[in-house]
Amino acid sequence: MAEYTKAVVDGRPCFHISLVVDVSPNCDCHGENDVPILPNIGMFASFDPLALDQACVDACLSATPIPGSQLANNLARPDFEDHHDHFRNSTPESEWRSCLEHAEKIGLGTRSYELVVMK
């Protein structure tokens, strides 16, 4: 995914916007998807697509899961191994970190950012 993004944005002026709403346990393309696991987090924007993704992830990881969601139910189970990562706790086989690491390695952007909150 990182290579495709780099091919599209490399050498072109771009501004990226992400709306972090109705964060579901699986990709929206999955037919078996469940109710959102996280509340609406907000809107993020950056000239750096990787910094944008990292800011969105960090905001999600610090959010409280929606009660009754797959994530909240997983965390409530006494035998559940908490990975301290909402995405892995929802979908243990998730390897989202490797995509961001690879994107930084190929020069798509930086995972460092300064968050400016606007209200």
Residue spans of the language-model regions?
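Extended, low-polarity segments enriched in aliphatic/aromatic residues
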Residues: 1-119
